[in-house]
């Protein structure tokens, strides 16, 4: 699909200066394609429809046929299986390192794909990210999507070419947070 986003994991970061501007390049990263799966949700008692965007994860690497032809079937499809695992089962047990790593990858994958999609649509409409905070509000209601803050900073600095202060100003004016677990009705009551 045309709106597929690329989410990058790992790799190395290279910095270079050009005409007084710092540029950041992520090299040798593992790239996972985020494929949008849009579901139309009809409003109650109205003719309006909203779109709920979900994401599927796919590998950018094809099955390694040289490994496959040598009988190493699982190794040949390893990249594909790992990419698909990101979106297959959410929130695995995190009482071991593998579960913690997968949860973090899932959180970053969904945040990055969604923010890249929002930024692309915004840039298509307005031609700039400088007014992002005037047209968008991103509400995070839990700790899982908190990665939206550093990812928006990355997009504004690395992709849109802003300096830190401008990117931080736009980010703080674009992101809102409500921690429901601190609200009174979610707290246990003391016993008499």
Model feature map: region roles:
Residues 1-9, 14-17, 45, 60, ...:
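Conserved internal helical-beta-strand scaffold that buttresses enzyme catalytic cores
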Residues 46-137, 147:
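Function-dense linear segments that define catalytic or interfacial modules
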Residues 51-53, 135-138, 164-169, 173:
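Beta-sheet entry/capping signal
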Residues 112-116, 151-159:
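Alpha-helical support elements that line or immediately flank enzyme active sites
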Residues 121-133, 156-169, 177, 181:
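Secondary-structure transition/capping motifs at alpha-helix termini
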Residues 139-151, 174-178:
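Core structural elements
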Residues 185-192:
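Conserved small/polar residues in nucleotide/adenosyl-binding loops
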């Amino acid at each position: 699909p045309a709106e597929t986003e690329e989410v990058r994991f790992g790799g190395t970061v290279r910095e270079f200066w050009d005409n007084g501007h710092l540029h950041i390049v992520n090299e040798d990263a593992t790239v996972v394609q985020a494929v949008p799966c849009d579901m139309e949700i009809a409003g109650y008692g109205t003719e309006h429809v909203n779109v709920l965007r979900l994401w599927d994860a796919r590998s950018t690497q094809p099955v390694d046929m040289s490994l496959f032809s040598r009988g190493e079937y699982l190794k040949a499809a390893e990249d594909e299986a790992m990419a698909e695992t990101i979106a297959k089962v959410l929130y695995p047990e995190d009482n071991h390192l593998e579960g913690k790593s997968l949860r973090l990858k899932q959180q970053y994958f969904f945040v990055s794909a969604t923010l890249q999609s929002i930024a692309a649509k915004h840039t298509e409409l307005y031609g700039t990210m400088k007014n992002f905070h005037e047209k968008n509000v991103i509400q995070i209601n839990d700790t899982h999507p908190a990665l939206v803050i550093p990812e928006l900073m990355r997009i504004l600095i690395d992709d849109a070419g802003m300096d830190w202060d401008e990117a931080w100003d736009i980010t703080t004016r674009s992101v809102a947070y409500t921690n429901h677990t601190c609200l009174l009705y979610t707290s246990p009551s003391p016993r008499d």
